[in-house]
Amino acid sequence: MSRRGWALFSAMAVIWGIPYLLIRVAVRQLDPGVLVLLRTAPVAVLFMPLVIVQGSVRAMLKDFKWIAIFGIVEFGVPWYLMSTAERHISSSLTSLLICCVPLFAVVFQRIRRTEEHISPRRLLGLGIGAVGVAFLVGLDLRGGSITWIALMLIVCLGYTIGPIILALKLTHVPGIAVVAGATAIVALIWLPWGIVHWPTHISSETWTSVAILSIVCTAGAFLIFFELIKEVGATRSVVVTYFNTAIAVVLGVIGLHESLTAGIIVGFPLVLVGSIFATSSAKSEPTILVA
């Protein structure tokens, strides 16, 4: 990758590594549905003017049905389930489970029998990265609730299917228009729930977490991610998931006092090695979004 590619990649790793901590902080006071509303509404408000300037309103409305389906599968359901799960499991474990997404994507590729050749080198890289993440967190499934882990696997499924919808039905619609329409629809869906479950008081800490989560980690992240896709392609962009996890673990340990395991010392180098191997593929594939 070029220097610009690495810069964008690093920025994405940080920006998409932060949300796990922010969600964990926000759900202490906010209902998960309220958090989804507060995360999507500002993005829609910020992106809609860009859609108008681009002249993409007609394209967005023409494919309203598929944008709605994409939004529900990629944002509406996963973000609610993730926020619910983070009330019961650590941000580190959450980020680890999200790393199943690239592996799910490979499985879906094989099931769909796409023409793209998945090289042994790339499969090895994804495998090494997954093992590294497991060492990073020192995962013990017996120590966590199977219910919340199951919810996170559903999140991973949504994050896998969403990009497939994007690739099959929405490639002709500008990315910003898709995100603007999808977040607007999800915000409207969760609006009644948000009104009913709105808390009587929201602390400044919670507002700060929500603001960063929505404006920086969602709106800002998508703008950077679109540039990253242009620079390095969708295949290499997938690997940002592993770096997200490394950063999420560090933030969980420092900011939330989550357990610091010896596996971090072993796991982080494995994540880096796995990422290098996995980025060696150059052919395109459906973009994987894991914000």
Regions found by a protein language model. Give the residues of each.
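Transmembrane alpha-helical segments that form core, pore/gating elements
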Residues: 47, 105-107, 111, 129, ...
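Specific alpha-helical transmembrane segments that line the substrate/conduction pathway
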Residues: 34-45, 73-74, 79-116, 120, ...
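Hydrophobic transmembrane alpha-helices of multi-pass small-molecule transport proteins
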Residues: 47, 68, 99-100, 108, ...
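Juxtamembrane helix-entry segments on the extracytoplasmic side of multipass membrane proteins
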Residues: 1-6, 28-37, 59-65, 138-161, ...
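Glycine-/small-residue-enriched transmembrane alpha-helix faces in small-molecule transporters
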Residues: 1-37, 72, 80, 84, ...
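Specific transmembrane alpha-helical segments of multi-pass solute transporters/efflux pumps
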Residues: 15, 19-20, 48-98, 131-135, ...
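Helix-helix packing/entry segments at the starts of transmembrane helices
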Residues: 37-38, 75, 94-100, 163-187, ...
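Transmembrane alpha-helices of multi-pass small-molecule transport proteins
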Residues: 29-77, 100-109, 158-162, 179-197, ...
